[in-house]
Regions:
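A cross-family "folded-core" feature that marks the main globular domain of proteins
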Residues: 1-241
Length: 241
């Protein structure tokens, strides 16, 4: 079989199929016979993932860590065969590359000689490894922007109820928050951290509004499927204030 179409979608399908094969009692036989995946290739990927776990001080779930080495071997083959993610991520790339987690994973990959030449592949591989704790991996880079805007509108409606104030120029506010929360989605969803923080002086100035915003972010947390850290709520508060 040959896969055609958007490379990210193709990889999502390969990941789904890999998961399904792993559920079979003949999984290793299928991988070895039909895809010629060698035990040494799998062991190299497992070693790399264990090093990432040590570097990040995390432990990935058993089912993901079983599937991941096989998917990573297939991913490496696609990249070597010229199937590259062509999307350009602009500010999103900078948001991810500035994180401590990205630096740690790149350090491990470079040390093992596994670092792709393409920066978009750096991002893809980094986010895939970080996402091993997440259930739905079908679209690592994608998010539903319409759904995000809907949840921003719900957040603003809740904020207006909590403050008993009608906000001005809500359309522009929604647009600004959508632009900010797109890269924030990846920081929050994958638990990414950086050395950048707001100063205590700025936080103190925002505190009166911060607590109201914090009490209104439930719709956004529903979208992210994660609790929003206080530092991210402070950044959201800056847009409101």
């Amino acid at each position: 079989y040959y896969f055609r179409g958007d490379e990210e979608a193709v990889r999502g399908l390969i990941l789904v199929v890999t998961d399904q094969v792993m559920d079979s009692i003949y999984n290793r036989l299928i991988f070895e016979k039909y895809l010629a995946i060698q035990a040494t290739e799998i062991e190299e990927q497992r070693k790399m993932l264990r090093m990432v776990e040590d570097e990040l001080q995390v432990q990935y779930t058993d089912n993901r860590i079983q599937t991941a080495p096989y998917f990573l071997v297939l991913l490496d083959r696609r990249v070597k065969n010229g199937h590259i993610i062509e999307q350009r991520f602009g500010l999103l790339a900078k948001e991810i590359m500035d994180t401590n987690e990205y630096a740690a994973i790149v350090k491990v990959l470079a040390g093992q000689g596994m670092l792709p030449k393409s920066y978009t592949e750096h991002l893809y591989l980094c986010l895939y490894i970080l996402s091993l704790k997440i259930t739905d991996l079908s679209n690592i880079f994608s998010l539903n922007k319409e759904d995000l805007r809907k949840h921003i509108e719900l957040f603003i409606a809740m904020l207006e109820r909590n403050t008993i104030i009608q906000l001005n120029d809500k359309e522009q506010l929604i647009e600004n928050l959508a632009l900010h929360l797109t890269p924030a989605y990846y920081r929050i969803r994958y638990g990414l951290t950086s050395d950048y923080t707001l100063t205590d002086i700025v936080k103190n100035q925002l505190d009166p509004l911060f607590f109201i915003v914090k009490s209104s972010v439930a719709p956004l947390e529903e979208f992210f499927e994660e609790r929003i850290p206080n530092d991210e709520i402070y950044l959201i508060t800056m847009f409101i204030g």
